[in-house]
């Protein structure tokens, strides 16, 4: 199944690169990535994103030249959590096979529950309800949890629950429950888990149990995912390509969805 999907994705990319494709097919490609700038949300204890110009203008030789430098923690903005982030001995970001960075997108919508409960946790019942409507989650899928939280981006106070640097005691946003993480890790064969909040775990978590379970099963995470409201519950194909940092525990990722 996964090999067929990869071939289909290659075919799609060939179509999109063809003559005239931009006029007819670009509406079927969704960018699931928040831009990186000084407002990009990072974990309260992490070094935020910083970019500055090194050169910008006409060179001594009379031609235009521009260059910049950036710095940041691995974990912030739209990024990928490598399994080694919370899974000892598991894959670093450069060790994740390319075949696992693409797959069918499964979008589980819990926006209604999260609207009235900021600390809501995805349950196993939410997952099985999705399956009753759409069929069992296929092997190699990338499960995306839609909480509706991206509407608060980049307002740190509303998105995280606190805009105080270093404050991890007063965070409030949705995430996964232990039972949901265990269900996906043990009863399904997913490659990745994405969410439109700052963490796979809810903001109130102190032990990051969803990270422990999923990363421990060599499942990577995608956090601060954008534009989930533009994807159907099933049928889209996701491509998530992170910066290839040797030995990295995570890094910025460009996520693209191809609509059916």
Which residues fall in each region the model found?
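Bacterial N-terminal signal peptides
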Residues: 7-15
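Active-/binding-site microenvironments in catalytic and ligand-binding cores
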Residues: 20-260
């Amino acid at each position: 199944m996964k090999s067929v999907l990869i071939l289909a994705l290659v075919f799609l990319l060939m179509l999109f690169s063809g003559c005239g494709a931009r006029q007819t097919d670009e509406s079927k490609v969704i960018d699931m990535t928040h831009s990186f700038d000084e407002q990009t949300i990072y974990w309260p204890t992490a070094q935020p994103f910083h970019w500055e110009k090194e050169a910008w203008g006409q060179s001594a030789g009379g031609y235009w030249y521009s260059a910049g430098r950036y710095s940041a923690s691995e974990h912030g903005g739209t990024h990928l959590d490598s399994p080694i982030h919370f899974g000892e001995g598991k894959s670093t970001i450069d060790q994740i096979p390319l075949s696992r960075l693409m797959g069918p997108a499964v979008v589980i919508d819990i926006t209604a529950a999260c609207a009235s409960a900021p600390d809501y946790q995805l349950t196993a019942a939410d997952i099985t309800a999705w399956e009753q409507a759409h069929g069992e989650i296929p092997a190699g899928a990338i499960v995306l949890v839609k909480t509706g939280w991206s509407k608060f981006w980049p307002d740190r106070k509303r998105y995280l629950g606190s805009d105080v640097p270093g404050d991890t005691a007063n965070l409030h946003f949705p995430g996964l429950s232990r039972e949901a993480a265990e269900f996906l890790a043990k009863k399904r064969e997913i490659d990745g888990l994405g969410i439109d909040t700052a963490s796979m775990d809810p903001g109130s978590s102190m032990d990051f149990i969803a990270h422990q379970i999923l990363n421990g099963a060599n499942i990577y995470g995608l956090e601060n995912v954008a534009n989930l409201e533009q994807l159907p519950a099933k049928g889209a194909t996701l491509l998530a390509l992170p910066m290839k940092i040797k030995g990295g525990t995570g890094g910025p990722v460009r996520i693209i969805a191809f609509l059916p």
